[in-house]
Swiss-Prot record:
Entry EC number(s): 3.6.4.-
Source organism (scientific name): Streptococcus pyogenes serotype M3 (strain ATCC BAA-595 / MGAS315)
InterPro entries: AAA+_ATPase, AAA_lid_4, DNA_helicase_Holl-junc_RuvB, P-loop_NTPase, RuvB-like_N, RuvB_C, WH-like_DNA-bd_sf, WH_DNA-bd_sf
Keyword Transit peptide recorded: no
HAMAP family reported for this sequence: DNA_HJ_migration_RuvB
GO MF term set: ATP binding; ATP hydrolysis activity; four-way junction DNA binding; four-way junction helicase activity
Location within or outside the cell: Cytoplasm
Protein name, per record: Holliday junction branch migration complex subunit RuvB
Gene3D superfamilies: 1.10.8.60, P-loop containing nucleotide triphosphate hydrolases, Winged helix-like DNA-binding domain superfamily/Winged helix DNA-binding domain
Highest taxon of source: Bacteria
Gene that encodes it: ruvB
Length: 332
């Protein structure tokens, strides 16, 4: 069963990220601190006629890291070439990409923490001094070739900044921590999306939808699509607060934005392990999910909302989790 709160990109669905993506900083809703900083750094680079320093964007999935990379490129008026860590399997793959860059271009690497170390090491001299040395041939006939690169900006995006090596992380002069969105910003995003796609929704409905979107624009837009379907078939096509409540209840998305998998995690901890501590591996087996999936997709929001704690001995369900799910709490 597909997870309605899944953060995966929506592919060819109507509400594509590309269609909804703002083009410039003034169009970008939320992330005010990051926007304020980037506006200064971008303007300074333009006045000096220099490439922007390398940028690392990090935070949970679905918070607009890719969108921010495109916005930076538009603000600078430069081209952006896009790839991802898993797609760059060999050093030669990265060399080919770097060799195509024009002065001032942006190279955007999504999931940069998943690059192989052999590939990552090629970036060190490229980022610091704009050159690469590559070996061609084998054995006694091998030789090193020095390639100068034009000044460029590398933008790396990651959900796991802690997995970056120290040498790579140190070469990013600018960092942007993308945080979960506030309710008012998500409400504005929902209303903007509704306007773009000519969906009739009242303000209270947009606010309710925003409250249950896990602080994540991608999820808010996906839920809007599902609620629109519900309103079209069950109602008169207009999304009201009542329609929103009924649709999200049908989708098992509760008032805190937790879906059936989030609730399954917490119920498993409470019912089987007295609230914990329980190890991540054990918990993952019990709910039939991959360990990395639990750690990267589910835990951050549960922790941020105060339902879950990470301790040295394992995961622990909080008193708030007990209260939210209707379990009596015993402080052991």
């Amino acid at each position: 069963m597909a997870r309605i709160l899944d953060n995966d990109v929506m592919g060819n669905e109507e509400f594509s990220d590309r269609t909804l993506r703002p083009q410039y900083l003034h169009e970008y809703i939320g992330q005010d601190k990051v926007k304020e900083q980037f506006a200064i750094f971008i303007e300074a680079a333009k006045r000096r006629d220099e490439s922007l320093d390398h940028v690392l964007l990090f935070g949970p999935p679905g918070l607009g890291k890719t969108t921010m990379a495109f916005v930076i490129a538009n603000e600078l008026g430069v081209n952006l070439k896009q790839t991802s860590g898993p797609a760059v399997e060999k050093a030669g793959d990265l060399v080919a990409i770097l060799n195509e860059l024009e002065p001032g271009d942006i190279l955007f690497i999504d999931e940069i923490h998943r690059m192989p170390m052999s590939v990552e090491e090629v970036l060190y001299s490229a980022m610091e001094d704009f050159y690469i040395d590559i070996m061609i041939g084998a054995g006694d006939t091998s030789r090193s070739i020095h390639l100068d690169l034009p000044p460029f900006t590398l933008i790396g995006a990651t959900t796991r900044a802690g997995m970056l090596s120290n040498p790579l992380r140190a070469r990013f002069g600018i960092t942007g921590h993308m945080e979960y969105y506030q309710e008012k910003d998500l409400t504005e995003i929902v209303e903007r999306t509704a306007t773009i796609f000519e969906i009739k929704i009242d303000h209270e409905a947009a606010r309710k939808l925003a409250c249950r979107s896990r602080g994540t624009p991608r999820i808010a837009n996906r839920l809007l699509k599902r609620v629109r379907d519900y309103a079209q078939i069950i109602g008169d096509g207009i999304i009201t607060a009542q329609i929103t409540d009924r649709a999200l209840t049908m989708l098992d998305v509760d008032r805190e934005g937790l879906d059936y998998i989030d609730q399954k995690i917490l119920r498993t901890m409470i019912e089987m392990y007295q609230g914990g501590p329980v190890g991540l591996g054990t918990l993952s087996v019990n709910i039939a999910e991959e360990r990395n999936t639990v750690e990267e997709m589910y835990e951050p929001y549960l922790i941020q909302k105060g339902f879950l704690m990470r301790t040295r001995t394992g995961r622990v369900a909080t008193q708030k989790a007990y209260r939210h799910l209707g379990y009596p709490y015993q402080n052991t």
